[in-house]
Amino acid sequence: MLGNIKPEGKQKEVLALPATGHTVVLGTAGSGKTTMALFRAIGLANLPSRPNVLVVTFNGALIQYMSAITNTSLRNLRIETYHKFARGYLNSVGKMPAWNGILNPEGKEYYISQALEAAKKRWPEESTFKRPISVFIDEITFMERFGIETLDDYLRAERIGRASVNIKRENRKWFYKIYEEYRALRVNPYDWDDIALYVYKELQSDTRPRLYNHIIVDEGQDFSPMMIKSLIAAVDENGSFSFFGDVAQQIYGSRLSWRDSGINIRDSKIWRFDKNYRNPATISAFAKDITGSVYWEKDSDMVTPTNFIAKGPKPVLIHFATKENELAWLIEQVKTSALASSNVVICRNRAIIDEVNRAFTRNGITPTIINKNQAGFASVKDVYLSTFHAVKGLEFENVFIPFLSDDIFPDKEILENATSVERALADELKLLYVAATRSKYGLFMSYHGTLSQLFPEGSTNYDKADGEDL
């Protein structure tokens, strides 16, 4: 069904899960969640009734990867991002403009700033309006992702994931006024964070037969509660909704609860997978040490790997005196490794990706840059470049994570604009966890100058090396 990929052990049980109701599958990195999601999708699509099946994920690169390994001609199986689904559905009910339907983040910040300036003039003595605009952007985004539409809803709301931002209950009314004014000012009907709410509302009054009998969400931890609610509402009442997620990778999210997301698991058990089919025990041990950091946000649903299939060397951390020396070593190492294995270089942002790409090109290396239109494959001997976010769900034989220097990682701009430095550091640390757990064999990390405060330096599950001696 998936080329030479076959379900192993407990994974086979996912194929026999009921074709009705809600199912939640949680697993460690490397436990095969994406593989299980695809097996379930193909199994459902091949039922005698030939039901329509939708697989939804957040990451464009992962869409390309899933489509490639599925390699199926099943016309009743679709794989797409949430926002493609949302635009398509709203278009089907005549609610998606041909142009300027969705406001971009820059436009969102502009209109919120306009609303804030107007409020300052109208209520000059109100101290709430002296808070940074980033606090208002984040709070409005929280309201959108949780589908809050009235002041009463907001006043009653449990601010999941926002506890570190101190907003007194009596001051919530001022944030809601900015939210109202923002919605009144913008000319676009939606932004990227509230489009799920409008999809959900349209579905509530849509009496047409549902297009999809079964919907499967992969990398579900990246979805907001309203995204999940809207997808559940889009499923035929006699169909099924399946959620596959890794609670150790709550990067974008809302730290969503099952209740807030509309997932009914009272009558369904949560499936937990702790067998790691990707990472060697050495890398899993190092990844576990990342989760032991004081910066890590603890989660009661965390699944710790207990069994390991692969074998491999310890991860290695290499220190260089200068950035130039670090980059020179990276070029030579990648050149050698590319002849026999799949390799990915994971960087913090696109600017660093571009810098590394130029250096590689000058030295005769032509890397493939992973983005929403291009995935990476462990079976292809090649060199890939990716950001931390774009590499989610993918795997490679060798992973290189350069520039783990304190002035680069964590991202200083992210910290400066954060409403909660504690939360921002937790999210940055989870990026390192994601990157490290992409490896099927080798994990090479490097830095110049001072090592990042987020690196688990006290771990005994990695080796150190001095780049000047290599």
Please give the residue ranges for each predicted region.
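A basic/glycine-biased coupling hinge at the interface between accessory DNA-binding modules
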Residues: L47-V187
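Amphipathic alpha-helical surface "interface" segments used
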Residues: I133-M143, I160-S164, V199-K201, T304-I318
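Short coil/turn segments at secondary-structure boundaries
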Residues: T28-A29, L151-E158, P189-L197
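Conserved helicase motor core of SF1/SF2 NTP-dependent helicases
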Residues: N4, G9, E13, T23-L54, ...
